[in-house]
Amino acid sequence: MRQTTFVKHQEVKQKWFVIDAESKILGRLAAFVASRLRGKHYPHFTPNVDMGDKIIIINAEKILLTAKKEDQKLYYNHSGYPGGLRVRTAREMRAKKPIALLERAIYGMIPHTKLGDKQRKNLYVYSGSEHPHLGQNPEKLEVK
């Protein structure tokens, strides 16, 4: 009789990967990265264990939005005070903080739980082509 095996967090070996976001479409890249951060690409995926990889994204300011989303996609923030709703377009978000578009898209695709918080900490996004994680020898990863 076969038994289902579950991976323990001590058995997980996290790998480092670097992704160049230049000329990549925001939603497709975000979905790919979110899946990698959760570890869903592994055949022994266990939903209650942080088994995802560590992902470094460079050139986040050069990400693409399709159609007219640059001006029509809206991001909402609320301060918690009456009348404190702030609405910004994707163009305004990119001008103010270029990595916010990508981080927010990826964070929205990861569960909002304690485990999701751990998985979000494995994401490193940089607006330029340089990153400080050369000591980890990250492998280059191509998005499909």
From Swiss-Prot:
Keywords: Ribonucleoprotein, Ribosomal protein
InterPro entries, alphabetized: Ribosomal_uL13 (IPR005822), Ribosomal_uL13_bac-type (IPR005823), Ribosomal_uL13_sf (IPR036899)
GO cellular component: cytosolic large ribosomal subunit
Molecular function terms from GO: mRNA binding; structural constituent of ribosome
Known partners and oligomeric status: Part of the 50S ribosomal subunit.
Protein task: This protein is one of the early assembly proteins of the 50S ribosomal subunit, although it is not seen to bind rRNA by itself. It is important during the early stages of 50S assembly.
Protein name according to UniProt: Large ribosomal subunit protein uL13
Provenance organism: Mesomycoplasma hyopneumoniae (strain 232)
